[in-house]
Every structure is written in C-alpha cells, then in structure tokens.
Amino acid sequence: MIQKITKSFCILLVAIVVCSTASAKPKKEAGSVMKALLITGGCCHDYREQREVIPMSIDMHSKQKIEWTILHQRTANGSFELDFYKNPDWAKGYDVVVHNECFANIGSPEYIESILEPHRDGVPAVLIHCTMHCYRTGPTKEEWFKFCGVHSPGHGPKHPFEVQIAAPEHEIMQGMSNWTTPNGELYFINKAYPTMTPLAESKSNKTGEMNTNIWVNAYGPNKTRVFATTIGHHNETMLQAEYMEMITRGFLWAAGKPVAESLKPAKK
C-alpha cells in the first residue's frame, strides 16, 4: 500500500510500510523488513508522481517486506543543496538508497563527499535517470562519475527506443526480453569505468550509436553494489511492466537478495 504524501513547504520525509514475505538480506531472518530510502527532487522531471511510482513498482514485484522512507525536495532548482545530506549519518540504518534526483549545478567537494561516503563505506545504491547528470561541476565531479560507473555528457531528443539486453545471463536480466519504451530520453555515455558491467543498451535516433542504459557498478574499496539505469524520464516509461520488473530486479540485486527467488510470480 502506498500512502498518499501530503503537501509540505520544502522537504517531505515520510515512512511507508508495506508488506510481502521474504527476508531483507541473506543474513536476516525470514520475514524481516528491509529499510529503503528514496531521495528525489530537483530539475526537469515529474518527481511528485515518480516518488510514488518507484516504491509501488518494487512493492508490486518483490516478495520483500520493505519500509520506505521518501525524501522529496520540492524544487526545480538544480543547484539546491539538501541539508539532509550534510548530516554524516544520513544513510545510517538503510539497507539500500534509491537516488532519483536532478541537481546538476552543484560542485561543492564537501557536499558531494557527504553523499558518496556512506556508499563508499558499503551502503548499496540504485541510481535512476538524471542522477547520472547530478553534481557534474566543480573539481571533484569525476568522483560522482566513478560512483555512477559512467560519465554522461547529455542526452538526445525524446523518442521511443528498443532496450536491447547485452548480458542475458546476469542475475538482473536473466529471463527478460528486449522491450521498446513508449517514450524516452537516451543518455549519451562517453566514458565507462572499468568497475561497471553493461546489462542493456539502446540506439540513438540522433547519432545512430548504441549507448549503455542499464548497468551495475562495483564502487569503491568495498565494491559496493550500485545498480543504475538512465531510462526513466517519462512516467509512462516507468509504468511499463518491463521497466517495473527491471527496476525491482536491480533493487533486489543491489540489496544482496537472490533476484529470481525474491520476485513475485508473473501474472498470467
């Protein structure tokens, strides 16, 4: 059950408890609850709707019990710093953090480091769409790119594209087939770090080139699990059955769950 989120002045923080039937991590007892944090907001996207679509999708497709905390920064300002990130314990207690945000014009090394440190220390992450375009100014911008596993300088025109699976045997993609988005913004990838593994790609109508748009990354000295996708500009794309399954699989993988065993059976 997704709780409707009421209007607040600036920052919205709400915990949503949902039920299913698996364990949060392999080390936890059956029936335990995974704690997930979704951070969203910023420029250029419908984060008001997506803050509900993402948890709903994962809850619909996963057996896992998840307690969601949603932090929504209600601003279109791409240079707005969240006080939340300035607390060194901001990620404490969460099993996985989902970043669906768009704050491109922030370059403060101290601020960026405050976001990266918990992930470098081992907190798993799911990165969606414009998160790959965040924090791309300033002297330490490449540290963010290393976390993402790629550098994306921009995107092409909006158009549907076929998602072509490049790693069908990977746990996340196993059993999935290629699909075509109803609409989309294909991000260009001009650098892939050696820590990332491509899972799927699509062809740009503008350049004719293939660009990775689903991948995993082993971040930092602890090889923290990071699942990332640049797909997800439009709500109708996020609401596709294939997208919802894909984001659930990536979430479960990042959290250290056996993906196939943790998915609900597909409805026939």
Segments (PLM) and residue ranges:
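Short, solvent-exposed loop/turn segments at secondary-structure junctions
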Residues: C43-C44, A104, M132-C134, K203-K206, ...
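Catalytic beta-strand/loop cores that center a nucleophilic Ser/Cys/Thr
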Residues: D59, K65-E67, G93, G156-V226
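A glycine-rich, often tryptophan-bearing local segment used as a flexible ligand/cofactor-contacting loop or short
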Residues: A104-G175
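Extracellular ligand-binding/catalytic regions of CAZymes and related secreted enzymes
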Residues: K27-V33, E49, M60, K92, ...
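Active-site rim elements
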Residues: G41-C44, C102, P157-F161, G232-Q240
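Bacterial N-terminal signal peptides that target proteins for export
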Residues: M1-C10
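Helical hinge/lid and interdomain linker segments adjacent to catalytic or ligand-binding clefts
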Residues: K28, K35-I39, D46-H133
